[in-house]
Amino acid sequence: MKVLVTGSAGVLGASLAASLSASGHEVHGVDVRAAAVPEAAHHVADVRDTATLRGLAAGMDAVIHTASALPSYPADQIRSVVVDGTRSVLDAAHRAGVPRVVHISSTAVYGLPRLVPTPEDYPQVPVDTYSAAKVDAEVVAREYRAKGMCLSVIRPKTFLGPGRMGLFAMLFEWAREGRNFPVLGRGDVRIQMLALEDLVEVIGTVLRAEPDIANDTYNVGAAEFATLREDFQTVLDAAGHGKRVVSLPIGPALAMLRGLERAKLSPVYGRLLSKLKADSYVSIDKAAARLGFAPKFSNRDAILSTYRWWTEQPPATGSGTSSREPWRQGALSLVKALF
């Protein structure tokens, strides 16, 4: 199979391109950054460059759209990359007659759902620029489904694996330095995550699935997950300094973090702050029943494997806004002296 992977220099895109190449597929990657997978052909381009995407999509058997923006991006860039980029990719695939497309969305489309586990048909109520953009990108996807495209929509929870940094690099850094790590309130909320390897596997599954199975929308997340306190504690235990997850009074801590966010002095964005106050997990029953999805890894497995990978990397010399880079801690780099 000849497959085009957008966002192929990202954490998911690179892992997916490597996996597909190892399975014998001819993989072409496209990203604004340099190649991350030597086994795959690489094209430096922006997914919003419609003319270039049309050329790349020609002759493909499948397109997997992983390119996206993150909540840490400026608002106008989030919408442009997520919505306009998705339309550009799907337009190119449609014009080229690509028989199979996989669109990687997010469980952020549910906003802050009151029902857990959250099913795929739960109302989409975006609460910020990022979640609104993800909702609108799915609207675009449905437009192309209506035109006859076989299009899988995958909604993963936050995924972890080798290559992933972002906000998790802060937890890892504090753990390695022998610090306690704070959580809001008791930290007894259950936050479902997902192992990168499980996500790559389910994407491969929808590529091979019959059209009536593939042409659908699926939540994917870990089947086993504990409380945030317990999952974060596994990292502190692995660091071996005897440190603990410590509770912060939820009211004052939220007020401080929201103030720091408004002043652009903290990478902890608003929707994440709200998520940390309540359980957040989705139903994976549909993916299990129709795709045979059976996650191999728990939250604990995913976060520990990512931490172990991180400890083997040379110290970061800077920060950025992608999931491959540690995010700038801002004022929190000073606060950590208290822990």
Q: Where on the chain are the PLM-derived regions?
A:
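N-terminal Rossmann NAD(P)H-binding glycine-rich loop of SDR-like oxidoreductase domains
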Residues: 3-23
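NAD(P)H-binding glycine-rich loop region in Rossmannoid oxidoreductase-like domains
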Residues: 45-84, 92, 107-112
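Short alpha-helix in the Rossmann-fold core of NAD(P)-dependent oxidoreductases
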Residues: 79-86, 102, 133-134, 192
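Conserved Rossmann-fold NAD(P)-dependent oxidoreductase catalytic core, especially the SDR/UDP-sugar
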Residues: 88-130, 144
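Active-site Tyr-X1-5-Lys
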Residues: 127-152
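Substrate-positioning beta->alpha
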Residues: 136, 164-170, 185-207, 215-216, ...
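Flexible, glycine-rich beta-alpha linker
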Residues: 152-170
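Mid/C-terminal beta-alpha module of Rossmann-like enzyme folds, strongest
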Residues: 209-268, 284, 300, 304-307, ...
